[in-house]
From Swiss-Prot:
Belongs to the DHHC palmitoyltransferase family. GO terms for biological process: negative regulation of NLRP3 inflammasome complex assembly; peptidyl-L-cysteine S-palmitoylation; protein targeting to membrane. It catalyses: L-cysteinyl-[protein] + hexadecanoyl-CoA = S-hexadecanoyl-L-cysteinyl-[protein] + CoA. The active site is at 132 (s-palmitoyl cysteine intermediate). One of its GO terms (molecular function) is protein-cysteine S-palmitoyltransferase activity. The DHHC domain is required for palmitoyltransferase activity. This is Palmitoyltransferase ZDHHC12-B. GO terms for cellular component: endoplasmic reticulum; endoplasmic reticulum membrane; Golgi apparatus; Golgi membrane.
Length: 270
């Protein structure tokens, strides 16, 4: 399930963890609300903050090290992709039983619908969304929901950290004195603000795409994708409506055979 911790993303993950805990330490070393409550023995807020930071780090490692949905061998993946449950055979057009999947020119496996080969990971990934350099892993069928959850938790941590940094700024008679007193905290607040804006944009874009049941790859490259390029600009064969899309993404744990969904919409074989 998990890749080698000391793989190609080791430096990226190490840098993320160091930056996270250095900024947390800065917030506790300056005269912020966290520091003041800790000194007065009111530990509820500091403990909750540290626990939330820890949860964000654990989620980061989960999405970073998790198998995003690599397509492995033809035998097991073809059986999964083309297998049709007896109770649903009558609902699925006959064409789905003879789908000829495209063979990847890189890893030579047959690609299920919505999968794509990642040049960095050197694997085809089911329901490929994108390769994220932040986590040094692909975002795909198995870890996408956890990636969105991580973004949500990380955004809350960053907003809370920004508020704590603001509470720690002290007054001074001159700008020079103010910068000497608050320079380190100001630098930390600037980093947190930039990261918060970045995470907010990522979270918003992913929630929007999830609500449409489309991926970053499909949204950006639909004119190049064989099963989408013949569709109209506003047509998405996987869209079931916002609520059902969100429910399926966050709450449905069973793997989806996207060929079944695609042909139920009356699309022609590709």
């Amino acid at each position: 399930m998990f890749k080698n911790v000391f793989g190609s993303g080791f430096l990226v993950r190490t840098a993320h963890v160091i930056l996270t805990w250095v900024i947390t330490l800065i917030l506790f070393l300056h005269d912020t609300d966290l520091r003041r409550q800790e000194e007065t023995g009111e530990l509820t807020l500091p403990v909750l903050f540290v626990l939330l930071v820890l949860v964000s780090v654990l989620l980061y490692f989960a999405v970073s090290l998790m198998d995003p949905g690599f397509v492995l061998t033809d035998d097991c993946d073809l059986q999964f992709t083309l297998g049709i449950a007896e109770e649903t055979q009558d609902m699925i057009p006959q064409t789905t039983k003879s789908i000829r999947l495209r063979r990847c020119g890189h890893c030579l496996v047959q690609q299920p619908m919505r999968s794509k080969h990642c040049q960095t990971c050197q694997h085809c990934v089911r329901r490929y969304d994108h390769h994220c350099p932040w986590i040094e892993n692909c975002v795909g069928e198995r870890n996408h929901r956890w990636f969105v959850l991580y973004l949500a938790v990380q955004f809350v941590v960053l907003l809370w950290g920004l508020y704590m940094a603001w509470s720690g700024f002290s007054h001074a008679s001159t700008w020079q004195q103010w910068l000497r007193t608050n320079g380190v905290l100001l630098g930390a607040a600037a980093v947190v603000a930039i990261l918060a804006l970045t995470v907010l944009l990522l979270l918003g874009s992913h929630l929007y795409l999830v609500s449409l049941n489309t991926t970053t790859w499909e949204f950006m490259s639909r004119h190049r994708i064989s099963y989408l390029k013949h569709c109209g600009a506003d047509e998405n064969p996987f869209d079931k409506g916002i609520l059902r899309n969100l429910w399926g993404f966050f709450c449905a744990w069973e793997p989806v055979v996207w060929e079944h969904v695609y042909f139920k919409q009356g699309n022609d074989p590709i």
